[in-house]
C-alpha cells in the first residue's frame, strides 16, 4: 500500500510550478508528498499547512511554512481522502484535521486529491464522517445527529488543533452529499464536518499497480 501512496505523491509533484505557494493537507499519503516536495524545495516559495502535524513535517524537511492569512492566492492544494468518488466528492478528516483542510481547500484555486485505489468508491458512506464539535456541545450535537439517522461515536482522548473534539458518525444517508454537509454544519456547536461535497477535488490522482490515473 505504501508503494501506491508514493506513486500518487510523485504524480502530484508534476503539478508544482516554480515559485508556487502550496497548500499541503494531512495524512499518510500527504506525508509521502512532503518527502517528494523536499527534493524540489528550492523551487517553491513556501507551503501553507493544514495541521500542526503537517507543519512539523514540512519544517523538518526544511520547507518554509507561512500562515494562510498572509496569502492572497493559493494556486494549489494537495491532500488525500478517506473516500472519494468519480465526481470528486470526498469524506475526509480521519486524521482530525478536517476544518483546516476544508478552509485551505476553499482558498486554493486547484485541489488535487491523491489516493490509492482502495479509497475510490461508487457511493460515499462506508467510512465514518468526522464532525468537529465545541466540547460543551458534544451531547447535544450527538442527539441532533441521531435525529439525522447517524450513529455518532466520541473519539476518546483526541483534541483537534483548534481545541475541539471529534464525533465519528456512521450510517449517514449520502443520497445527497451536499445537503448532508449542510445539515451537519447547521447544528449549533458543530464547527465543521468531513463531507467535502461543495468544495470538490479538481483532480483525483489514483494510484494502482498499473500506474496513476486521473479520475476527473
From Swiss-Prot:
GO terms for molecular function: ribose-5-phosphate isomerase activity. Pfam families: Rib_5-P_isom_A. It is an enzyme of class 5 (isomerase). The active site is at residue 101. Pathway: Carbohydrate degradation; pentose phosphate pathway; D-ribose 5-phosphate from D-ribulose 5-phosphate (non-oxidative stage): step 1/1. GO terms for biological process: D-ribose metabolic process; pentose-phosphate shunt, non-oxidative branch. InterPro entries: NagB/RpiA_transferase-like, Ribose5P_isomerase_typA_subgr, Ribose5P_isomerase_type_A. Substrate binds at residues 26-29, 79-82, 92-95, 119. Keywords: Isomerase. It catalyses: aldehydo-D-ribose 5-phosphate = D-ribulose 5-phosphate. GO terms for cellular component: cytosol. Its EC number is 5.3.1.6. It comes from the Bacteria. Catalyzes the reversible conversion of ribose-5-phosphate to ribulose 5-phosphate. PANTHER family: RIBOSE-5-PHOSPHATE ISOMERASE. Homodimer. Belongs to the ribose 5-phosphate isomerase family. NCBIfam families: PRK00702.1, rpiA. This is Ribose-5-phosphate isomerase A. It comes from Legionella pneumophila (strain Paris). The lineage of its organism: Bacteria, Pseudomonadati, Pseudomonadota, Gammaproteobacteria, Legionellales.
Amino acid at each position: 500500500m505504501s508503494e501506491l501512496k508514493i506513486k500518487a505523491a510523485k504524480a502530484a509533484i508534476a503539478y508544482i510550478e516554480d515559485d508556487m505557494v502550496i497548500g499541503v493537507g494531512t495524512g499518510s499519503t500527504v506525508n509521502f508528498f512532503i518527502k517528494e516536495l523536499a527534493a524540489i524545495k528550492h523551487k517553491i516559495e513556501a507551503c501553507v499547512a493544514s495541521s500542526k502535524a503537517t507543519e512539523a513535517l514540512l519544517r523538518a524537511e526544511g520547507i518554509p511554512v507561512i500562515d494562510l492569512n498572509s496569502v492572497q492566492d493559493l494556486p494549489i492544494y494537495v491532500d488525500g481522502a478517506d473516500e472519494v468518488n468519480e465526481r470528486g466528492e470526498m469524506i475526509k478528516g480521519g486524521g482530525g484535521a478536517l476544518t483546516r483542510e476544508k478552509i485551505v481547500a476553499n482558498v486554493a484555486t486547484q485541489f488535487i486529491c491523491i489516493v490509492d485505489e482502495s479509497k475510490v468508491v461508487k457511493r460515499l458512506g462506508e467510512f465514518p464522517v468526522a464532525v468537529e464539535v465545541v466540547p460543551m456541545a458534544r451531547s447535544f450535537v450527538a442527539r441532533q445527529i441521531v435525529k439525522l439517522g447517524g450513529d455518532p461515536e466520541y473519539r476518546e482522548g483526541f483534541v483537534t488543533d483548534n481545541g475541539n473534539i471529534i464525533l465519528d458518525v456512521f450510517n449517514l444517508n449520502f443520497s445527497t452529499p451536499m445537503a448532508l454537509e449542510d445539515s451537519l454544519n447547521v447544528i449549533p456547536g458543530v464547527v465543521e464536518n468531513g463531507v467535502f461535497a461543495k468544495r470538490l477535488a479538481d483532480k483525483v490522482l489514483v494510484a494502482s499497480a498499473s500506474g496513476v490515473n486521473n479520475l476527473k
